[in-house]
Regions:
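Structural motif
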Residues: 11-13, 201
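Aromatic- and acidic-residue-enriched carbohydrate-binding clefts of CAZyme catalytic domains
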Residues: 3, 37-76, 106-142
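Active-site-proximal helices and loops of the catalytic beta/alpha 8
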Residues: 1-6, 18-24, 28, 34-54, ...
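Glycan-binding loop/region signatures in secreted carbohydrate-active enzymes
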Residues: 95-150, 217-218, 225-244
Length: 244
């Protein structure tokens, strides 16, 4: 994927309402959906609780945006129109109840944490705090626990089996290094690496050098406003702010 890529970010679109044919006509090369894991509460029609889409309770396809069958249909439509399909994924945390706790809807098998997971991050330039502590009230999952890793990697396979080409990895800078390496390996194994990238925004430049397992975007300028899409120059998504 060395040519310039233009991604249409279908933020909070229902899968069966994404205008695939029109997106292709406008010159986009990929469509990115919002996360598709089930959320702790229904998403309101006016989207005043859209934040809930980033608070999953499991690692299975299906929420208010669509079912696994909707995703398969979307993938087929994308591929028929020469587009790749990217899905936003949330691996750092599961849903909370109110803050620094866990939603009662989350099953016990997903409740594996670090010793400091329920303490808020204070220093965002400290790699240990970034990866082992709570992100704004969302406790960090223990991504070195095999039950968690297996559940998440099974979710990636579900996405691949549905026709997804790659992933946008939410809160990438908050994932522990050993997990990031395994995640990159899994994406390669599934054939999803080329169209996957990690979110690393507002990170110290020195820390950015550590996030070299997969391509990144590292500033807000790569995410357009008004849900119109992100223009990402591949050659590993490099730009003036991200030479790594």
């Amino acid at each position: 994927m060395k040519e310039r890529q233009v991604i249409f970010q279908a933020w909070m679109y229902r899968l069966n309402e994404i205008p695939v044919e029109e997106v292709a006509k406008q010159g986009f090369t990929a469509i990115q959906t919002s996360p598709l894991q089930y959320t702790k509460e229904p998403i309101h029609e006016n989207l005043d609780n859209a934040w809930a889409i980033y608070q999953p309770i499991n690692y299975d396809i299906g929420n208010d945006l669509g079912t696994v069958e909707d995703l398969r249909n979307l993938a087929n439509r994308c591929h028929a129109n020469g587009l790749k399909l990217i899905v936003d994924i949330v691996m750092h945390h599961v849903a909370n109840e109110k803050g620094n706790d866990i939603s009662h809807l989350v099953k016990d098998k997903y409740k594996h944490f670090y010793s400091d997971s329920f303490i808020n991050i204070h220093d965002y330039n400290n790699e240990y705090e970034l990866t082992h502590m709570s992100l704004d009230g969302l406790p960090a999952l223990n991504l070195e626990n095999e039950t968690i890793v297996n559940a998440q990697f099974n979710y990636l396979k579900q996405l691949k089996d549905a026709g997804v080409d790659g992933c946008r990895i939410d809160a990438y800078k908050h994932l522990v290094k050993s997990y990031r390496i395994r995640l990159a390996e899994k994406l390669r194994e599934l054939g999803m690496f080329e169209y996957s990238y990690g979110e690393v925004i507002f990170a110290d430049t020195n820390l950015q050098r550590n996030y070299n397992e997969i391509p990144l975007y590292v500033n807000q300028s790569l995410c357009s406003s008004d849900q119109y899409g992100a223009i990402i120059s591949h050659d590993d998504f490099k730009n003036s702010d991200n030479p790594y």
